[in-house]
């Protein structure tokens, strides 16, 4: 059985302020028509269940906690939040990995985004997002 999928990578190394979404970057792999990426979101255009995997590497200019949360249509996805502590500013790299299953209801479209939270804004050196329609 073939599954629709998308895999995006952003390794531009941009700082992302707290409360903002992380740009998803370039499409590296894509199969099928029900998944697309634009700016800071992955667009899901067919009903069903989708497996989402996110891996992000980052540092921060200040000591503190960095939180990344997966959101579906602006609402946090339950269990898809990760926090790492930066103890040494600008030189310490940290990684957050998230996995979740989301659902798109019948006759609906949905947008997935990754939002920054915590006490310090990260500089994300790499974020990879994979989504597979199950």
Language model region names:
Residues 1-134:
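Extracellular jelly-roll beta-sandwich "head" domains, especially the C-terminal globular C1q domain
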